[in-house]
Amino acid sequence: MVKQRKTKYTSLPLSSLFEDASLSTKSPKREPSQEKEIKKEEIIKKNKPCKYEEECKRSDCVFLHPGEKMPEKPKPKETERRKTRMCKYVKKCNKGKNCPFAHDESEIYIPECRYGYKCKKQGKDNEPGECKFSHPPPPPPSPPSPPPKEEIKEEIFEFEITNFPTMNGEEPVALESSPTMDFSYLAEEDFLQKFEEKKSLIEESEKHRKCTINGSIDDMMKIFETMEGQDISQYYFNF
């Protein structure tokens, strides 16, 4: 008979086995005031009478004492009864609304199809299809997007003043080259400063009756209407 050697075990505290030398700080201890607050929060409702009744001296007793009321029982939530089959005792059934089965086809609950309105097996035009589940209506179409705004394109054109009043009694003098005015500056911030520059060009153009405009027709009308003491109706333009 072979004797088996018995292994000897040394008794070690369990804390030494799970101790981590890398932890430099220990978990914070709770103060006694915090422990009392936690114990009070753990007591939700007292639902049993204390056997010591008035002689009980514990302030944190979890049982009811004389003068304390029993907590009210929570009311069960009313669950919606979904009837999926017709009652086979429709004519003889006396349960009425409490019957778990339907007494009319309108009471039968049909679960919704997981594919929703995208189901390809649903019927069309109020005709039954292969799918026996209910299908919601498709969402309404999104409103059409507004048309893009038309950008005002700048045009380069020349106009000639054919009937322009004289300036200070002098006849207009024709120059070799006509000044060029750019009216696309109306949307910029320094409008007043540039307006004075364009105004001087307009006065210069009056001398030779011809001017080249770089901008839109609407901008040209605005610049003439903005000038004080000027009436655009007295100008005649040939484009």
Curated annotation (Swiss-Prot):
Residues 28-40 have a biased composition (Basic and acidic residues). The keyword Manganese does not apply. Residues 20-40, 128-151 are annotated as: Disordered. Residues 135-147 have a biased composition (Pro residues). A zinc finger (C3H1-type) spans 44-68, 81-106. Coiled coil: none annotated. Signal peptide: none annotated. The keyword Metal-binding applies. One of its GO terms (molecular function) is zinc ion binding. Pfam families: zf-CCCH_2 (PF14608). Keywords: Metal-binding, Repeat, Zinc, Zinc-finger. It comes from the Viruses. This is Putative zinc finger protein 132L. It comes from Invertebrate iridescent virus 6 (IIV-6).
